[in-house]
Amino acid sequence: MYQIEFKEEAFLPRERLVEVGAERLSNQELLAIFIRTGTKKEPVSILSNKLLNRLESLAALRELSIEELQSLTGIGRVKAIEIKAMIELGKRINQSELLLNERILGSEKLGRKMIHEIGHKKQEHLVALYLNTQNQIISQKTIFIGSVNRSIAEPREILHYAVKCMATSIIIVHNHPSGSVQPSRNDLLFTENLKESCEKLGLVLLDHLIVGNKDYYSFREESDVILKFIDNIVEEVFFNLTFTVE
């Protein structure tokens, strides 16, 4: 008797998807379709609910590791891998839709896009977007992921792909895992260095964005502040050199 009830419950979300469409299903029902089956003690609906209740928000699902998923009763290694694959595929579909013939019209639109993509990352990620003469994104590359041994990307890595895809301009985006989007001294110096390197190759650095989990900072929008800061750095370096000579 139990097995018959179990099978009926497991297939119910699938039947509802066919009847009313995927967009009408709850998060629990969609997740239950991927988990597929429950255990002898708990049906799949309970398992999917337990997983969702463990999260602060649905977006936090993408942060769970395979091991963390496996720690839930009823989710083995295969199911955990399938869930991770489902999340990654969804992210790539969303990214490809945004990327397809997308034209960069402003820092805010791009900032919101990149908050969604890398704002939640626990390691620093630096992403380069390469654009054509119509300001359409023709390629997006993750150039750098922070590690214990390395925390700075090199301009040559960014420019290599620019030449390869024949881009005319570049936008750089990186996240601050701390959540603060204020640029550091290294961020400012890196931006100026990259800008000069781009100019030598006839490329335009359109913007450098810093994103957190809720907000973004645009170097282009804050250009006056950046220029003043760089001028102060140059003056400070000049003063130190003069002082050393004396």
UniProtKB/Swiss-Prot annotation:
A motif (JAMM motif) lies at residues 174-187. Zn(2+) binds at residues 174, 176, 187. InterPro entries: MPN, RadC_JAB, RuvA_2-like, UPF0758, UPF0758_CS, UPF0758_N. Keywords: Hydrolase, Metal-binding, Metalloprotease, Protease, Zinc. One of its GO terms (molecular function) is metallopeptidase activity. Residues 103-225 form the MPN domain. Belongs to the UPF0758 family. This is UPF0758 protein SSU98_1084. It comes from Streptococcus suis (strain 98HAH33).
